[in-house]
């Protein structure tokens, strides 16, 4: 891991980068594969070694692209993938993980997430995750798109408190997790992984964001990422299929924003004053 990238600790004590790379949509167009591989390798080169993918992304082709990109560099990477909820039965979880590992060309996942709540009992999924840990096929497991009530239900099942992370939709325009979910996870030393950290680009034309970013000779995307990196226990995983955009994203760690400017951003993107149901994309 690059020493310049801030780190976040898992419950196990392992430190992982607070800024990684998402791979949603990668693998959908064969013509873009070469550049996608270059982007993943650029992320590794600059210390953004947490690579997030899922069996859902491009029907597994995203995992295949990641596998090609990390060939010969597996030990440099913190590899995350996710399982469809309808695959997350006792036997289905094992089988889905093995398929993901085959596509990734890896013998293990560092973190395996249940993509969202589904019909399979949490007890079954958790037991299967723990079995995968025993088999050495995953190091840790976690969840995605779980709100506080989901997390409390999870912690009530056997071994549910071994959950290592929760990946949710969180960015300047969707600050609902700050009201209760983020504090809940922080109290348990559980990282929150923020997907769509720049709202798929939709927040980048906000006047306050543009104005403040210019004052720091930064881009609006860098400032939006810096907002998340300021939060304890939060990991941002922006997706980028272009190496130059990966470099831009990495620049977010250099920003030191004043309290006055954070207050201006709070006025433009108000923090929640009440419970907001967790949103999903």
Question: Each predicted region: which residue ranges?
Answer:
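A short, structured active-site edge motif that brings together acidic residues
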Residues: 76-88, 111-115, 145, 168-170
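Short, well-ordered coil/turn segments that N-cap beta-strands
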Residues: 15-19, 47-50, 74-77, 106-110, ...
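Short, acidic/polar
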Residues: 30-43, 89-104, 124, 151-152, ...
